[in-house]
Design a protein with these regions (language model features):
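Juxtamembrane boundary at the C-terminal end of a transmembrane helix
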Residues: 208-216
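Acidic (Asp/Glu-rich) catalytic motifs at the cytosolic membrane interface
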Residues: 67-83, 87, 91, 96, ...
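A generic structural signal for well-ordered alpha-helical surface patches
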Residues: 151, 171, 206-207
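Short, conserved aromatic-histidine micro-motifs
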Residues: 126-136, 189-191, 196, 215-216
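Membrane-embedded alpha-helical bundles of polytopic integral membrane proteins
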Residues: 1-157
């Protein structure tokens, strides 16, 4: 990663040298480098989850299930009672529609899914083995680290908080750059980062939780 960043700095600097426009060179280099580090480094934790733990594929799937549980719970509760209990919005200047009620619901939604992790894990493991039955092999390891009680609450709280932070940071970046969407790759869905902004912050959280906390 360090070598890649150095190479990127050299290329970006050379590009600025040969540009006719000489203003805002540092700003352009800084924005580009931030984008490279922000997206590539944070999202690279998906590979760490996949390859550093038994059944990494299943762990990645379950991580995205937690993100979706957080997003869906926050959205539904926010639409239903957002602003009715807590009058102050979560971050009114950055994302006016986000409510404190929705944020709390996101944490609770993640917590409930984590408590069902053992059943979900076995379901996915059996599904993977069912697919691999045609090749008469099953590479799934059924060893599972139960996450319950205080650990489950800590993980749910961390995912709920950092999923919201991921959304807010991406919204802040778009407002700073005065763009509506983060790209046009996913038409009708706001852009690539609009779909994965939560994941960028949550993937590292889950990785370090599994590495340093889950097995305690």
């Amino acid at each position: 990663m360090g070598g890649f960043i150095v190479f990127a700095i050299i290329l970006l600097s050379l590009r600025q040298v040969f540009k006719v426009k000489i203003h805002n060179a540092m700003a352009e280099i800084s924005y580009t480098l931030f984008g490279i580090i922000y997206v590539s480094y944070l999202f690279s934790h998906i590979l760490l989850l996949k390859y550093e733990f038994p059944n990494g594929n299943i762990l990645v799937v379950m991580t995205f299930m937690l993100i979706w549980a957080c997003d869906i719970s926050a959205y539904l509760v926010g639409m239903a009672i957002g602003g009715k209990i807590f009058k102050h919005r979560l971050a009114p200047k950055i994302s006016p529609k986000k409510s404190i009620e929705g944020a709390i619901a996101g944490i609770l939604g993640v917590f409930l899914v984590i408590l069902s992790f053992d059943k979900i894990y076995l379901f996915i493991a059996n599904f993977v083995c069912g697919i691999s039955f045609l090749t008469k092999t099953c590479s799934v390891n059924y060893d599972y680290v139960a996450i319950g009680g205080l650990k489950a609450f800590i993980l749910a709280l961390a995912i709920g908080v950092f999923a919201e932070l991921g959304d807010l940071v991406e919204s802040k970046i778009k407002r700073e750059l005065e763009v509506k969407d983060s790209g046009n790759l996913l038409l009708g869905h706001g852009g690539f980062l609009d779909r994965f902004d939560s994941a960028l912050f949550v993937l590292p959280i889950v990785y370090y939780f599994m590495k340093y906390v889950a097995y305690l």
